Curated annotation (Swiss-Prot):
Belongs to the transcriptional regulatory CopG/NikR family. The lineage of its organism: Bacteria, Pseudomonadati, Thermodesulfobacteriota, Desulfuromonadia, Geobacterales. GO terms for biological process: regulation of DNA-templated transcription; response to nickel cation. Transcriptional regulator. The keyword Oxidoreductase does not apply. Keywords: DNA-binding, Metal-binding, Nickel, Transcription, Transcription regulation. Ni(2+) binds at H79, H90, H92, C98. It holds the Pfam family RHH_1. Binds 1 nickel ion per subunit. This is Putative nickel-responsive regulator.
């Protein structure tokens, strides 16, 4: 982490009141930490848009394991990307439905492609990709 720099910001009074409410709701200790998090989030999202940055994400899937060949198809997709799918968690939600959470690491565009392939498998009831940073480039 580099040297800390102080700077001033001009902001509309109502916007500041709303921001202070957000700070309190989220539990930040001060405005500075909230602003740092907003800047980090914007930088991370920008890197995802480019698609060439190393990122990590979770792909969450909900599906009925009784659907013919669905579990096998999902497993095949994971093995097809064995170098990118670094971990998997399987949970039995009830007698029929399973939750699977996969941790995927790679270039942002690769992670998105893998998630789309998995979520698009016929029989998946719900799927979601949540991407985040590896943390290497953040300060």
């Amino acid at each position: 982490m580099g040297e800390t720099i102080r700077f001033g910001v001009s902001i509309d009074e109502k916007l500041l009141e709303s921001f202070d409410g957000l700070i309190e709701e989220k539990g930040y200790m001060n405005r500075s930490e909230a602003i740092r998090d907003l800047i980090r989030a914007a930088l991370v999202e920008l890197k995802w848009e480019v698609g060439d940055e190393e990122t990590v994400g979770t792909v969450t899937l909900v599906y009925d394991h009784h659907v013919r060949d669905l579990s096998d198809k999902l497993t095949e997709q994971q093995h097809a990307h064995h170098d990118k799918v670094i971990s998997a968690l399987h949970v039995h939600l009830d007698a029929h439905n399973c939750l699977e959470v996969l941790v995927v690491r790679g270039k942002a565009r690769e992670v998105k492609k893998i998630a789309d392939e998995l979520i698009g498998v016929k029989g998946v009831k719900h799927g979601k990709l949540v991407m985040t940073t590896t943390g290497e480039e953040l300060h």
